[in-house]
Amino acid sequence: MLKSTATRSITRLSQVYNVPAATYRACLVSRRFYSPPAAGVKLDDNFSLETHTDIQAAAKAQASARASASGTTPDAVVASGSTAMSHAYQENTGFGTRPIYLDMQATTPTDPRVLDTMLKFYTGLYGNPHSNTHSYGWETNTAVENARAHVAKMINADPKEIIFTSGATESNNMVLKGVPRFYKKTKKHIITTRTEHKCVLEAARAMMKEGFEVTFLNVDDQGLIDLKELEDAIRPDTCLVSVMAVNNEIGVIQPIKEIGAICRKNKIYFHTDAAQAYGKIHIDVNEMNIDLLSISSHKIYGPKGIGAIYVRRRPRVRLEPLLSGGGQERGLRSGTLAPPLVAGFGEAARLMKKEFDNDQAHIKRLSDKLVKGLLSAEHTTLNGSPDHRYPGCVNVSFAYVEGESLLMALRDIALSSGSACTSASLEPSYVLHALGKDDALAHSSIRFGIGRFSTEEEVDYVVKAVSDRVKFLRELSPLWEMVQEGIDLNSIKWSGH
């Protein structure tokens, strides 16, 4: 008779430590079916904290009511992670009171329903999804494939076209390096734009060192590319066009469908970095002729450390993998997948599709209120196209105020002056430079990010706080004093000393 793994472990332990096997047997807990108390809280899909209400207290009460209806207690809901939704008012951290969070382009808070989905994969369902000889592997592999289907459904793709990665940076590198390397004997030219994310720009520059030529398209003062310039840049040896769908600093939405049509007509692969667009704007890879698309989980209220790349199968896109190994993910991305992250990513994608209309209406309403309030102050400018912009990303320049000074003055609000990936640099935004903004305006820009869990009272507070502190900082500025006196600063010949 075959012994179970647990029984064999008990026998070995009793022999090594000379302790009766019955002692270990009495303490044995079936790990496979163990579930911690917090993991047992199941939040109803309809729990949408700020989608249907603007007051966090009311939203918490709504969550508690739903938990009570499902047989749990309000305390259990709080323990399961609903306190994460009151992120603006948490105390007892190493940095004092938690500020209001309006930096959604950097990352989004994990939805409690996503966390709830992930927990069981840290306890009972811990099998390797690539182990196909026993139920531990079958269980997690089923969950992985279900998640893959949810990720694909959001963009009308085939699940087999979704390759899981560690995030959008890896996905972008796979494309910018993998496609040109595969076609390097006949195709030596890449086209991208000057306002792409740093990982795309750096990957393109890396390919220049390998002998490829890269054309960086300009954008107009609204942040949009010129389609005629794109067509003129295409050469017989062009292998790839990469254009970001939604810009991470100014939220501008590029004409993806038109770009896809141009690329398909010229038989060139079209890649779009959709880290800021996936689940937030309508994307159909077939309708838009997209061949490759990068996705990030933590931008859609999912876990960090997981992302995906869409790779078209018909017509088939070929690329060299960055990683060598066991040939997982159809040979394009070797390495053992993390089922908790993949499952969380899939649940986040499912919720984004399910709540798409409600989320968009909520974010648009708060964005309109924020923009109206911020632009009511004099000498403020909305950066990027007002007509082709994702509402959840608002980038405003406050003339005669240093952006870093304003950020420090707004310590009770979590904001940024540009991409989180380059926030350590004090250089003005290269994206705003590409729009033709001078150093002064580029330095004075602040990015506001609105998301699913943002509230109307937070927006009201932010508008008032920003207006008050901009006024205070301007009163300290000699340049502002000169402007108030009617002096044209552009007419002054500044000394170089």
Curated annotation (Swiss-Prot):
Q: Which cofactor does it need?
A: pyridoxal 5'-phosphate
- Span of chain positions assigned to the transit peptide in the UniProt entry: 1-33
Domain of life, source organism:
Eukaryota
Q: Name one GO cellular component term.
A: mitochondrion
Q: State the compartments where it is located.
A: Mitochondrion
- What is a single molecular function from GO for this protein? iron-sulfur cluster binding
| Residues where N6-(pyridoxal phosphate)lysine is found | 299
Keywords, A to Z?
Answer: Iron, Iron-sulfur, Metal-binding, Mitochondrion, Pyridoxal phosphate, Transferase, Transit peptide, tRNA processing
What is stated about pH in the biophysicochemical properties?
Optimum pH is 8.5.
Spell out the InterPro entries in the cross-references: Aminotrans_V_dom, Aminotrans_V_PyrdxlP_BS, Cys_deSase_IscS, PyrdxlP-dep_Trfase, PyrdxlP-dep_Trfase_major, PyrdxlP-dep_Trfase_small
Record function comment: Catalyzes the removal of elemental sulfur from cysteine to produce alanine. It supplies the inorganic sulfur for iron-sulfur (Fe-S) clusters. Plays a role in both tRNA-processing and mitochondrial metabolism. Involved in the 2-thio-modification of both 5-carboxymethylaminomethyl-2-thiouridine in mitochondrial tRNAs and 5-methoxycarbonylmethyl-2-thiouridine (mcm5s2U) in cytoplasmic tRNAs.
Domain remarks in the Swiss-Prot or TrEMBL record: the N-terminal beta-strand formed by residues 99-104 is essential for the function.
Q: Which family does it belong to?
A: Belongs to the class-V pyridoxal-phosphate-dependent aminotransferase family. NifS/IscS subfamily.
Protein name (database record) = Cysteine desulfurase, mitochondrial
Q: What gene is it encoded by?
A: NFS1
